């Protein structure tokens, strides 16, 4: 007989055993996995493993190689990493080639700052020496960012990334430009572009942001020209315009009106102002706006008559500066314009084609008719690249006493241009009124200083030129948008509206660090079309990089025998958006491990006007379609209160800090649980919420590992599995569909939420809780225990592989704990799900079982709260079920086991008054009762058969049988 007084029953239980730590220690542990993956060259192993699978390509939008990564970079790269990993684990060869955008102004600025600190003059430094320093700076930052991305567990070909400054890349970018030139899409023109005086360069729309500023606003009188106004009584009157840019008045060439607006002729009857209109003056306004304008100028008025659009179209005006500075003697025509409204102002728009896109378009639309009327259609250049007026602004430019006035100075401060123009308008008695206005105004995203619209000679790509097949670049791009999948769908509308309304594409920048516009032109601006010259350029760039264009003797080298023909070498460089828009050519097309077009591009929502946009135009212009099949967009990261992160506000969260304090997997979990396509929030409390969620997840994984330490790999036939195990396998089937669908649609939050809920609600609080008794206490030969181990094994494999793309460090740690000889969880595939696991009938039955169970657990929670019981095993409640479908669902089940009680009774009798109920489960009531019998010293269940086996008098018959079996195996 066994001496039971010497048995430590806890040592007879199959309790979880694992070295998987409860404390993650991610900041210390994660770098070890980074090192492991590096040493084993995991990326290369995955390529070899998947070489015969279909390719899936996410093309990396290149971050700028300048500075440490910020939270936006982390969000972006994590999303990309999850996509590439998930497709790899679903049977694809999912390559990821990281890239960097290397040219452009920010890097030039860094070198120029260094020069200024050293007292060097950039203009005295040979251009290729300057470019060399830019290249070195970009290279250094690529190294820094590479390590930062790896620390986030970004898996990619970091040994062979792409960069826009690579010699081959520069050659291909130049080649793409030459394709536009050869097809006639590239032209030199002059247009008003957004110009940064501070940076001395034109800016693309993507390089501009808007901030509120306070500006001068003026109302200006344009007299009706006397010699053409004799046929009606508008003679001697004036048309009044309103503008917030007084400095553009010297560039005025027309006044626009709208045939949709009602206008009138008004006479001033009283005036209380120090300057401006006097009684008797007659002025033309939009009827809707005259009262507001005259109130501003402290005037009383009366309406004389209506003025028709037809009448306005026949008159011309005098320039308000006529007679000043020996210029402005030309007439100012009236143009009918769709852009004119009577929402604000006067109903007339001051039109300076040198200084506004709509002004330019209105002027060019009428250029032919204006020339026929004897009006010079040429557009002046009133403001230079330094913000000073030129000779095209007589009286304000170099001919002005004291030198030219300036719009904006080198520091981005307002110059004296507004002041001197307003003074001259007052002197000429052409100022109607003046004031100040706070409004949104464009600023350079880099310098944060205001920009101006100024007419400049630039290189453009036509948006609306017939490309020989009846299409235009615009029509091709719009068609491509319709053929592209957008996530979220609103991105399609956004990009379409931008393409529909955009002007011709400005390609040129007047800077040094970039790929040159490598063409030669004659005096008229015609581009040299010579295949031999182009080949010499391309060959040189391939071997030496784009520096070859700026080397001494480059013109003669490339032109060869044509050097004496008078061709001029263009010195401008390409907009960096053309660089990044061309990345598909030297990555997707040129690399054998990739393919064109890409399956997906993923970037922030600002890239609808940036990389998505430029890539679309570049590819449609040279290949007729988009370089991508799908576009996924994410929002921006705000602080936890929804405010924009700012160093000045002290509310920034850096990925480096989160990783150092909590680990990269915490940051990745945050990304996975946000609505990333919208703006997200991040701060200390949100990070803590994710830490708490991670701990629960980790504990669930840890429990499974501990339980599976006793798993000998035995399988029970599906038909022999208990219902509870079959229910869990059914749930795995449902989750498998959800996970695969979620990864397909990039809906990561849906996956993360479903898996976390499954682990917390269905595993920890339900299945595992129920099965702990069988797993810990049943005999080694127990079918129930073997079935539970088998099911936990299936759950573990699926959960860890499903979560591996999201939490690569933690799932690798768990996988190697379970399978120490494995290469990596990231070399695994999502497991196929047997069709027999799906059982919708069983799931519906258990929906009812769990409903009844909720009423029981609710009743027992009250008993515990009132300290009538300490554990549910002390209870044997009576359950009254009036709904037959609910009682039928319990047939054949050990409902006490499911409720984790030592006993349970089910009755169809009427429930006694005071029985516990839940409002959402009709027809079920519970009366708590204490369990009968004695407490088993091993399982702690109360049974009436404790001591039935005299050799083990302290335990139940089930536990005694288990002990006998352990004894026979020599484990007792």
From Swiss-Prot:
Coiled coil: none annotated. Transmembrane segments: none annotated. Keywords: Aminoacyl-tRNA synthetase, ATP-binding, Cytoplasm, Ligase, Nucleotide-binding, Protein biosynthesis. It is an enzyme of class 6 (ligase). A motif ('KMSKS' region) lies at residues 644-648. ATP binds at residue 647. InterPro entries: aa-tRNA-synth_I_CS, aa-tRNA-synth_Ia, Anticodon_Ile_BEm, Ile-tRNA-ligase, Ile-tRNA-ligase_type1, Ile-tRNA_ligase, M/V/L/I-tRNA-synth_anticd-bd, Rossmann-like_a/b/a_fold. A motif ('HIGH' region) lies at residues 63-73. L-isoleucyl-5'-AMP binds at residue 603. Its EC number is 6.1.1.5. NCBIfam families: ileS. IleRS has two distinct active sites: one for aminoacylation and one for editing. The misactivated valine is translocated from the active site to the editing site, which sterically excludes the correctly activated isoleucine. The single editing site contains two valyl binding pockets, one specific for each substrate (Val-AMP or Val-tRNA(Ile)). HAMAP family: Ile_tRNA_synth_type1. This is Isoleucine--tRNA ligase. It comes from Brucella suis biovar 1 (strain 1330). The gene is ileS.
């Amino acid at each position: 007989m066994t001496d039971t007084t010497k048995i430590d029953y806890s040592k007879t239980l199959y309790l979880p055993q694992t070295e998987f730590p409860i404390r993650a220690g991610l900041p210390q542990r994660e770098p070890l996995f980074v090192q492991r993956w590096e040493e084993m060259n995991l990326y290369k192993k995955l390529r070899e493993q998947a070489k015969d699978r279909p390719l899936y390509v996410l093309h990396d939008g290149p971050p700028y190689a300048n500075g440490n990564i910020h939270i936006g970079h982390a969000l972006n790269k994590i999303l990309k990493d999850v996509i590439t990993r998930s497709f790899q684990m679903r049977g694809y060869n999912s390559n990821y080639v990281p890239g960097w955008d290397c040219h452009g102004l920010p890097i030039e600025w860094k070198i120029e700052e260094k020069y200024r600190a050293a007292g060097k003059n950039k203009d005295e430094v040979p251009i290729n020496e300057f470019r060399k320093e830019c290249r070195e700076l970009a290279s250094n930052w690529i190294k820094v960012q590479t390590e930062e991305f790896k620390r986030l567990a970004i898996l990619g070909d970091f040994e062979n990334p792409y960069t826009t400054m690579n010699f081959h890349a520069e050659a291909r970018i130049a080649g793409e430009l030459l394709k536009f030139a050869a097809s006639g899409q590239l032209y030199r023109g002059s247009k008003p572009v957004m110009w940064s005086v501070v940076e001395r360069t034109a800016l693309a729309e993507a390089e501009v942001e808007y901030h509120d500023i306070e500006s001068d606003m003026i109302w200006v009188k344009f007299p009706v020209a006397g010699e053409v106004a004799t046929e009606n009584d508008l003679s001697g009157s004036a048309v009044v315009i309103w503008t917030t840019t007084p400095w553009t008045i010297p560039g005025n060439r027309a006044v626009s009106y709208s045939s949709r607006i009602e206008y009138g002729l008004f006479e001033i009857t009283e005036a209380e102002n120090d300057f401006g209109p006097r009684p008797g003056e007659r002025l033309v306004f939009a009827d809707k706006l005259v009262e507001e304008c005259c109130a501003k100028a402290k005037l009383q008025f009366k309406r004389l008559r209506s003025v028709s659009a037809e009448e306005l179209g026949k008159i011309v005006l005098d320039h308000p500066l006529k007679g000043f500075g020996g210029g402005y003697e030309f007439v100012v025509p009236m143009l009918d314009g769709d852009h004119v409204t009577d929402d604000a102002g006067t109903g007339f728009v001051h039109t300076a084609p040198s200084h506004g896109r709509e002004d330019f378009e209105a002027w060019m639309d009428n250029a032919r008719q204006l020339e026929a009327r004897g009006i010079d259609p040429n557009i002046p250049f009133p403001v230079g690249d330094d913000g000073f007026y030129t000779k095209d602004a007589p009286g304000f430019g170099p001919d002005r006493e004291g030198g030219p006035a300036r719009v904006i100075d080198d520091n981005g401060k307002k110059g004296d241009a507004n002041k001197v123009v307003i003074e001259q308008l007052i002197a000429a008695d052409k100022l109607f009124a003046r004031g100040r206005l706070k409004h949104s105004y464009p600023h350079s995203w880099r310098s944060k200083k205001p920009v101006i619209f100024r007419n400049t000679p630039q290189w453009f790509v036509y948006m609306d030129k017939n490309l020989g097949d009846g299409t235009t670049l615009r029509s091709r791009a719009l068609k491509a948008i319709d053929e592209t999948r957008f996530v979220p769908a609103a991105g399609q509308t956004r990009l379409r509206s931008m393409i529909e309304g955009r002007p011709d594409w400005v390609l040129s920048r007047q800077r040094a660090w970039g790929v040159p516009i490598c063409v030669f032109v004659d005096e008229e601006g015609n581009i040299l079309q010579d295949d031999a010259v182009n080949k010499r350029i391309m060959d040189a760039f391939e071997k030496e990089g784009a520096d070859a264009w700026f080397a001494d003797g480059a013109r003669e080298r490339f032109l060869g025998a044509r050097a004496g023909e008078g061709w001029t070498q263009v010195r401008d460089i390409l907009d960096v958006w053309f660089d990044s828009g061309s990345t598909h050519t030297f990555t997707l097309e040129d690399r054998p491990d990739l393919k064109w077009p890409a399956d997906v591009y993923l970037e922030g929502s600002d890239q609808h006007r940036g990389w998505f946009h430029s890539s679309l135009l570049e590819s449609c212009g040279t290949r007729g379609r988009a370089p991508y099949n799908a576009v996924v967009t994410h929002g921006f990261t705000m602080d936890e209160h929804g405010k924009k992160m700012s160093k000045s506000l002290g509310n920034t969260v850096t990925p480096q800090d989160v990783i150092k304090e909590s680990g990269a997997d915490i940051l990745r979990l945050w990304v996975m649980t946000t609505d990333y396509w919208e703006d997200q929030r991040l701060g200390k409390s949100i990070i803590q919420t994710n830490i708490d969620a991670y701990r629960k997840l980790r504990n669930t994984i840890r429990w499974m590992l501990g339980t599976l330490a006793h798993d000998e790999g035995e399988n029970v036939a599906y038909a022999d599995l208990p219902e509870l195990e079959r229910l869990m396998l059914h749930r795995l089937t449902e989750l498998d569909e959800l996970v695969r669908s979620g990864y397909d649609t990039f809906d990561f939050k849906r996956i993360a939420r479903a898996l976390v809920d499954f682990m917390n609600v269905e595993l920890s609080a339900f299945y595992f809780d129920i099965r702990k008794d069988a797993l810990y206490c049943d005999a080694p030969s127990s079918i129930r225990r073997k079935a539970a181990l088998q099911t936990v094994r299936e759950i573990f494999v699926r959960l860890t592989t499903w979560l591996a793309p999201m939490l690569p460090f933690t799932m690798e740690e768990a996988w190697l704990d379970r399978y120490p000889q494995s290469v990596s969880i990231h070399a695994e595939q999502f497991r196929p799900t047997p069709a027999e696991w799906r059982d919708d009938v069983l799931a519906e039955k258990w929906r009812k079982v769990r409903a009844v169970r909720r009423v029981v657990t609710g009743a027992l929670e009250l008993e515990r709260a009132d300290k009538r019981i300490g554990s549910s095993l002390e209870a044997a409640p009576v359950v009254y079920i009036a709904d037959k479908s609910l009682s039928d669902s319990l047939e054949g089940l050990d409902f006490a086991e499911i409720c984790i009680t030592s006993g349970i009774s089910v009755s169809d009798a009427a429930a006694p008054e005071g029985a516990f109920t839940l409002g959402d489960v009709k027809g079920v009531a519970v009366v708590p009762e204490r369990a009968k019998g004695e407490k088993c010293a091993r399982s702690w269940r109360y049974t009436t058969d404790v001591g039935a086996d005299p050799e083990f008098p302290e335990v139940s018959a089930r536990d005694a049988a288990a002990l006998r079996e352990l004894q026979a195996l020599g484990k007792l």
